[in-house]
Amino acid sequence: MAEHATGVYGHPYPRVDQYGNPVPPVDQYGNPVPDEPAPRDTAAGYVAPPDPAVSTGDYGLAGAEAPHPHESAVMSGAAAAAVAPGGEAYTRDGGGVVPPAGEKTFAYEGTVSAAGVTGASGQLQPTTREEGHTTLGETLRRSGKSSSSSSSSSEDDGQGGRRKKKSIKEKIKEKLPGSHKQEEQKQAGHTAPAAGTGTGTGTHAAGKHEKKGIVEKIKEKLPGHGHH
């Protein structure tokens, strides 16, 4: 008949199997649990030794090969030390020996690599991406800045090219009724005297008459300046 004892959570488990061999307790996941406190004889002051069948390792786990897959052999404390697979102690905050390359070390993702990434002071550094790597967001932001700077000074001409962007004042003039005709008439009035230079006073008088006719046409087109 196997001997039963009560565990940490009150569940009975056998300390010795049917052959008399000690059996270490396990939790619900099958991992060995820490040994329970030894019974204390308060009357005689005697403390019973712990069960030799259970040996606690790091984090109170039994055995040296029982760490959780996601648990680290590097403790989070400033002075907490761990033992490398080669038997040499090393610390998280520097001052110790880094485990040799190729040795298996238990660490959280991005904290310690298999080769043991260290800084200039011997501290274990988290593994990061390559410094020259640019993300997609940075590329889009850079392309957006370049396109916005180019679009601010030029615009598409509708024929696959770029042309200088017009100012707001020029756009307003284009939208006003009769503005194109007035500009064409002004240009015609300025070029008429230039074409008749050196031909005498008759051409100059004809240019004035032509300019006067243009002004009258403009007045006729303006509202309120029709027939008097």
From Swiss-Prot:
A GO BP entry: response to abscisic acid
InterPro entries in alphabetical order: Dehydrin, Dehydrin_CS
Coiled-coil residue spans: none
Biased composition (Basic and acidic residues): 169-187, 212-228
Annotated segments matching region Disordered: 1-68, 115-228
S-S pairs: none
PROSITE patterns tied to this protein: DEHYDRIN_1, DEHYDRIN_2
Pfam (any one): Dehydrin
Similarity comment: Belongs to the plant dehydrin family.
Protein name: Dehydrin Rab25
Species annotation: Oryza sativa subsp. japonica
